[in-house]
Amino acid sequence: MSDTKRPPTLLTAADIAAIPPRQRVHQFNSNAVRLTRTLGEVVGLQRIGVHIVRLEPGRESTQFHYHDADEEFLYILEGRAIAEIGDERFEVGAGDFMGFATPSPAHTLINTFDQDLVYLMAGERNPNDIVHYPKIRRSMIKGPGVRRWFDWDALHDV
C-alpha cells in the first residue's frame, strides 16, 4: 500500500509523532501545563478540537472547570492520574474514558504518579460558551474573537 496518494484526512502514527508538541499553560493555573499535539486542525476539523496530551508528573490538566456549551471527552492512553469529578476523586489509567456532556460536573486531572500521563482529548468548539471555575470563583465568557473573565465576588445585583 502506497501512502503517496494518502488523503489529507489521514494521519499515520509517524505523522502524529512528527507533530511538535506545544506547551500549554492554563491562564488561571500555572501548574496546569500540558504538552499538546493538535490533530484535528491538521486534518481540517473546525467544530471539534482533537489533541493528544502529555501531562508530566506533578502537573494538572487544567483548572477545575465545567462548560455551559462545549461537550468534551478524555481517553487515557498511557499512565495514571487522579480524576477529580465534582466532589469525588478517582484513580484512572490506560483504557479509561471520561465524557462530559453539558451540563457536567466540574473536572480536572492531576498526575500524582511518577510517570507521564498520555490521553486523547476532544471537545466541541462552539463559538459561544461560558466556562466556570468553581474553586477560584471565576467564569470565562467565550464569543467570536473574544474571551473575557469575571470574578464571582465582583458581581452585583441590579
What positions do the PLM features span?
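Ligand-binding loop in jelly-roll beta-barrel domains
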Residues: 44, 102-129
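Structural motif
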Residues: 73, 80-82, 89, 106, ...
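Short, conserved beta-strand element in jelly-roll/cupin
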Residues: 52-56, 66-84, 122-124
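Short acidic-glycine-tyrosine-enriched beta hairpin
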Residues: 87-102
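Short acidic (Asp/Glu) patches
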Residues: 60, 68, 102-106
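Conserved short histidine dyad/triad with adjacent acidic residue
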Residues: 33-38, 51-67
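A short, N-terminal "cap"/entry segment at the start of jelly-roll beta-barrel domains
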Residues: 1-47, 131-158
